[in-house]
Amino acid sequence: MYRYFLKLEKHTLVMLEEELEFVSKYCDLLRERFGESFVTDIDIPDKYHGARIIPCTLQVMVENAVKHNVVNSSSALHISIGVGMRHIVVRNNLNPKKTEPEVSTGTGLQNISRQYEILFNRRVVTGKTASEFIVRIHLIL
């Protein structure tokens, strides 16, 4: 994973395929930490693997879900990553932490959103239902 970060220093965009490999490894680490309480479903058809994405976008989305939700044996966190209408769609069930939210460092969802607006004049769209949080990120084809 560290090699991926070092490689990113020179790149504004990476292939979606590389990003998916990275987020899969990151999710493997989280599964070691949380066990069966951390569930992921990554379903991106091969035809999208050549699209481009800002580095670490998916890792930030997963990290955001873990940061804001309870993950334990009585409350599993389910995260799905898929494609819909030229967007990557990241969804997670909601089970918000009851404690005060951590102070934002500006390196998470807000930072990714700013990068997409500045570089591509595209918005990262977020939404929430009673049961899930959804993020839509425009694919750079």
Specify the residue positions occupied by each region the protein language model found.
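Two-component histidine phosphotransfer core
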Residues: 1-138
